[in-house]
């Protein structure tokens, strides 16, 4: 499965457009780690726990995007983007794009 952030894929032509496809994940933060991260904000610097959580969520959202595209017969996703939201310690990440069928030129 090819996933790209561009409208076209070099060396491929788009044979069919299926439309929008997405992958979503929602995760909660570990209470103990959140407390430690809160202390980290007092002294400054990267909050590694939150960075890792967001990285894992983005990877999971991409995998779900690929699975959803595959289910409808696509072999690529173009114009892939991310959106995220966090409220009350719960983070949602969505990866979305256009599911397409491509073939090599």
Swiss-Prot record:
Superkingdom of source: Bacteria
Pfam families linked: YbjQ_1
SUPFAM superfamilies: YbjQ-like
InterPro entries: UPF0145_dom_sf, UPF0145_YbjQ-like
Family designation: Belongs to the UPF0145 family.
Protein name: UPF0145 protein OEOE_0637
Organism: Oenococcus oeni (strain ATCC BAA-331 / PSU-1)
């Amino acid at each position: 499965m090819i996933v790209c952030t561009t409208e076209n894929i070099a060396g491929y032509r788009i044979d069919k457009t299926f439309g929008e496809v997405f992958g979503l994940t929602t995760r909660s933060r570990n209470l103990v780690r959140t407390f430690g991260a809160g202390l980290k904000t007092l002294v400054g610097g990267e909050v590694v726990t939150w960075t890792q959580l967001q990285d894992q969520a983005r990877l999971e959202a991409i995998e779900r995007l690929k699975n959803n595209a595959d289910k409808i017969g696509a072999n690529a996703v173009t114009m892939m983007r991310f959106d995220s939201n966090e409220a009350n310690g719960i983070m949602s990440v969505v990866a979305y794009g256009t599911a397409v069928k491509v073939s090599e030129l």
